[in-house]
């Protein structure tokens, strides 16, 4: 019997109701359904100065999810998709995203498309698009103190009421660079339309094999975002006396202390997105972020 996963944002009533409808219709068609909550992918915030439960990113995989699963349907907003990515990438289960949230930048379908979605799932009418992920590790000496998988970005920044930060960033074999800013963002192409975009970074199309380093509020006219090969590991050394906050995809993170370093590298586990139709990235940019809309001149004031 084919098996399909359901990953649901249990905090959204609409997502829960839709999950019940989907599960009923899939089971009537002879499909086994394994349901999980998206909260399982929300690692939360941890303090490396205290005892840390380091389980590795494989620990987020829900019970019953494995490589034999045909796909997992994700019900929620973009935050739910980021959590689901962390839950499914280690076992390479493809995800079909249905938006029940707000922006839905990562959504493949909407509730109005539900009948079509079910039909295409049952008839196996879909393709797979892979998106790269990152492994983000906090290291102290030879010890890994914290680790998580990231689809969008890692952001390392100062706490409130503290001074501007200084970072030494080593990219692969290249000479380290010094950055003075409120923080730094290391993003994938998928994450280039998220926090990195707000920090002034460029939009990167998903198929480009690159990563992006973007400073947050840099205190320099010459400090700009940098795009480089995703084959290069990145190490960020805090050059500041204050502890810093690190947040990964908005739902995981920890404190980083002056004696720590953050290692970011491309993961061997991409997120596999189910596509029901040709995915036109520039159309998504236009519809969701207003990119390329024609300029309409404002009338002169009387």
UniProtKB/Swiss-Prot annotation:
InterPro entries: ATP-NAD_kinase_N (IPR017438), ATP-NAD_kinase_PpnK-typ_C (IPR017437), NAD/diacylglycerol_kinase_sf (IPR016064), NADK (IPR002504). GO terms for cellular component: cytoplasm. SUPFAM superfamilies: NAD kinase/diacylglycerol kinase-like (SSF111331). Keywords: ATP-binding, Cytoplasm, Kinase, NAD, NADP, Nucleotide-binding, Transferase. Its EC number is 2.7.1.23. NAD(+) binds at residues 78-79, 152-153, 182, 193-198, 217. The keyword DNA repair does not apply. It comes from the Bacteria. It catalyses: NAD(+) + ATP = ADP + NADP(+) + H(+). The active site is at residue 78. Its cofactor is a divalent metal cation. GO terms for molecular function: ATP binding; metal ion binding; NAD binding; NAD+ kinase activity. Its main location: cytoplasm. GO terms for biological process: NAD metabolic process; NADP biosynthetic process. It is found in: Cytoplasm. Belongs to the NAD kinase family. HAMAP family: NAD_kinase. Involved in the regulation of the intracellular balance of NAD and NADP, and is a key enzyme in the biosynthesis of NADP. Catalyzes specifically the phosphorylation on 2'-hydroxyl of the adenosine moiety of NAD to yield NADP. This is NAD kinase 2. It comes from Prochlorococcus marinus (strain MIT 9313).
């Amino acid at each position: 019997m084919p098996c399909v996963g359901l990953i649901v944002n249990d905090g959204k009533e609409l997502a829960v109701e839709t999950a019940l409808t989907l599960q009923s219709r899939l089971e009537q068609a002879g499909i086994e359904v394994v349901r999980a909550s998206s909260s399982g992918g929300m690692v939360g915030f941890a303090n490396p100065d205290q005892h840390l439960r380091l389980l590795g990113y494989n620990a987020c995989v829900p019970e019953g999810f494995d490589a034999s699963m045909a796909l997992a349907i994700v019900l929620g907003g973009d935050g739910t998709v980021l959590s689901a990515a962390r839950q499914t990438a280690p076992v390479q289960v493809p995800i079909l995203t249905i938006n029940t949230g707000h922006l839905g930048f990562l959504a493949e379908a909407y509730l109005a498309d539900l009948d079509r979605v079910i039909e295409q799932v049952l008839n196996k009418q879909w393709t797979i698009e892979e998106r790269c992920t990152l492994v983000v590790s906090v290291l102290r000496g030879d010890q890994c103190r914290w680790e998580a998988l990231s689809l969008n970005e890692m952001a390392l920044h100062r706490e409130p009421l503290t001074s501007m930060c200084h970072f030494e960033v080593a990219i692969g074999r290249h000479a380290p660079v010094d950055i003075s800013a409120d923080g730094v963002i290391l993003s994938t192409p998928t994450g280039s339309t998220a926090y990195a975009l707000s920090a002034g970074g460029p939009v990167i199309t998903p198929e480009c094999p690159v990563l992006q380093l973007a400073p947050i509020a840099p205190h320099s006219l010459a400090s700009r975002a940098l795009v480089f090969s995703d084959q290069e590991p990145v190490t960020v050394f805090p050059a500041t006396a204050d502890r810093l906050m690190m947040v990964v995809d908005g739902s995981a993170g920890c404190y980083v202390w002056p004696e720590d370093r953050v290692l970011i590298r491309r993961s061997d586990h991409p997120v596999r997105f189910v596509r029901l139709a040709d995915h036109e990235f520039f159309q998504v940019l236009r519809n969701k972020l207003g990119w390329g809309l024609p300029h309409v001149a404002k009338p002169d004031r009387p």
